Amino acid sequence: MMSDVAERIDAKIEGLGDWRRETLGRLRALIKQADPEVTEELKWAKASNPLGVPTWSHAGIICTGETYRDKVKLTFARGASLEDPSRLFNSSLDGGTRRAIDFREGEGIDEKAFKALIGEAVAVNLAKSPKP
């Protein structure tokens, strides 16, 4: 059974109606493949973005998915702490905590490297989360 949040994220993605729909939809599928235990949420709803920002978490935020006119941006909450041997991060590189990947129209996704980055983000979150 699909959750209300999953349905709202579906609606947000479907509402894009262009290359961004396919890109964000594919990234979402890859996140779920990389971490079947991921939690999907919508955060930070506001008048200009009433559905909010799709957010994927596991022991803390992994990444958020935002769409702009010319790009789909995935921002990794602890990106500065992650190994990125494939050099996927191409935005927010000077931040002390976050890192982002901007996907533009016509660009491919290195699916293997992307899923490895998601796995690393989960591992970092689990290592930093308080133990019960």
Protein language model features and the residues they cover:
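Charge-dense, helix-prone N-terminal extensions
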Residues: 1-132
